[in-house]
Amino acid sequence: MSKEIALPLESGKKKIGSTYLKLTKPKVVALMLITAVVGMSLAPVVDFPWLQAAFGLVGIGLMAGSAAAFNHLIDRRIDARMARTHKRPLPSGDTNPISVAIFSTALGVIGFVLLYALVNPLTAWMTFLSLLGYAVVYTMYLKRATPQNIVIAGIAGAMPPLLGWTAVTGELHAHAWLLVMIIFIWTPPHFWAIAIHRVEDYRKVDIPMLPVTHGIEYTKTSILLYTILLTLVCILPVLVGMVGSVYLFSSLLLNAGFMYHAWKLKLSPEQNSAMETFKFSIYHLLALFVALLADHYLGLFFTP
């Protein structure tokens, strides 16, 4: 009898854990933390503060998860009406708004205290501003106010490399802002691709994404132009001496792939082209930052 009781309890605990993990958008947070690691690694520190860096990643991750959970909370009504999001924890009834509010607040507070006390105040406040930028400025206002929502608010999601840099140095640096700029320029074509794929969803809930307000063809052209701009921006770390030929070759190859998908999206009538572009953009950013990391450490290894 005790085993029969224990099994449902264990299953229930796993479901609760899975529900709250989904609220934090773990795949998105993981990608953000990878870019933060790159920021930490490229920062010019003589004696790398490993423990401080570890606490930095935990704190940044907790606050990013908090922002994601707040996004779920604020968007729960429109999520319930969209095909892409109606199975999220709140619309599906797996949890309730009060629990999510408590959970997201707790994550944010713990993350902030951790960063402030064990890393440095600058990183704590910069991460807090990023949280506000995404959870409040973007989700509560810009998303519903302008088709340039993701362009303006993209800075919030682009901050992790800078946060990683400040976590180990305690200061802002122009090179860190270059890494931010890469993600900032990458963000619009990434989101506009999924917006094209889900344009009817956004139209149904009156969210003024670019393909809703300006049309799909205009959005396709914008994606292509942004990928060209991204290619140019990605060269800047080489020009300022941050990284070398390994990154340059990788960057040109990856951006050629992104431009190919954007060009194909512009010219192709295929229905799945937008989703293919969206998926490629994720692999593109991941590979780009891995290339930054590889170039940096290969340079250290082979430098006499």
UniProtKB/Swiss-Prot annotation:
Cell location: Cell inner membrane
Pfam families: UbiA
Predominant localisation class: membrane
GO cellular component: plasma membrane
Keywords: Cell inner membrane, Cell membrane, Heme biosynthesis, Membrane, Transferase, Transmembrane, Transmembrane helix
EC number assigned by the record: 2.5.1.141
GO terms, molecular function: protoheme IX farnesyltransferase activity
Gene Ontology BP, a term: heme O biosynthetic process
The protein's annotated pathway: Porphyrin-containing compound metabolism; heme O biosynthesis; heme O from protoheme: step 1/1
Keyword Transferase annotated: yes
Transmembrane segments: 28-48, 50-70, 98-118, 122-142, 150-170, 176-196, 223-243, 245-265, 282-302
Domain of life: Bacteria
Reaction equations catalysed: heme b + (2E,6E)-farnesyl diphosphate + H2O = Fe(II)-heme o + diphosphate
Membrane topology according to the record: Multi-pass membrane protein
Role noted for this protein: Converts heme B (protoheme IX) to heme O by substitution of the vinyl group on carbon 2 of heme B porphyrin ring with a hydroxyethyl farnesyl side group.
Note: Carbon 2 of the heme B porphyrin ring is defined according to the Fischer nomenclature.
Similarity comment: Belongs to the UbiA prenyltransferase family. Protoheme IX farnesyltransferase subfamily.
Protein name according to UniProt: Protoheme IX farnesyltransferase 2
Species: Vibrio campbellii (strain ATCC BAA-1116)
